[in-house]
């Protein structure tokens, strides 16, 4: 599957998803370690999944945990990248000891705030993940500019029908694909994900 933008599959909660990611050449697998999230995965389960798969970079997605807790868990699991959605100050991030992706919620941030946030964290982060349920056409200019200046993972609204257009218009560094839940252990359908991948790779 060929596309200039990389792909991230998240949240990984089972071995089936991890194997799918590896088989399809997906660059990043996200594991949710935010205890307040419905997608929270026990670290011991994540460790089992990570040990059985290879080929994709592992991304630990954290919530409001303390910096030291994040650093210790990311080291214990040998995570490749840490994704943060909390308010840890930029100059504290090197203490984590891993490449950092800063998650930004556009639902609560206007264009000026977004520009300031990107500028403040850029020296300490390898990239940013933009989250939210915004109407992207209303913020097209700032999103194009952000994707041009920074490594942006697109976790904003898209559908199979328009994903190719989004990649062409905004040119994000990567796009986040949503991993669903297993119907039962070891059994899962991937029709929707395959449809998105086919749309991305279509001429």
Residue ranges and their predicted role:
Residues 1-154, 158-203:
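Conserved N-terminal beta1-alpha1 strand-loop-helix module at the mouth
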């Amino acid at each position: 599957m060929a596309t200039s933008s990389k792909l991230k599959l998240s949240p990984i909660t089972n071995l089936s998803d991890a194997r799918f990611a590896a088989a399809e050449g997906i660059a990043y697998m996200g594991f949710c370690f935010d205890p307040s999230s419905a997608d929270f995965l026990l670290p011991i389960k994540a460790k089992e999944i990570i040990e059985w798969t290879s080929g994709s970079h592992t991304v630990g997605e954290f919530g409001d945990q303390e910096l030291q807790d994040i650093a210790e868990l990311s080291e214990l699991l040998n995570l490749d990248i840490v994704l943060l959605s909390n308010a840890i100050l930029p100059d504290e991030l090197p203490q984590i000891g891993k490449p950092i992706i800063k998650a930004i919620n556009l639902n609560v941030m206007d264009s000026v705030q977004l520009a300031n946030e990107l500028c403040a964290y850029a020296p300490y982060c390898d990239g940013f993940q933009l989250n939210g349920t915004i109407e992207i056409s209303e913020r097209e200019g700032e999103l194009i500019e952000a994707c041009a200046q920074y490594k942006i993972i697109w976790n904003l609204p898209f559908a199979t029908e328009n994903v190719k257009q989004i990649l062409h218009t905004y040119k994000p560094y990567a796009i986040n694909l949503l991993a669903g839940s297993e119907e039962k252990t070891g059994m899962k359908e991937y029709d929707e994900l395959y449809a998105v991948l086919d749309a991305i790779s279509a001429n």
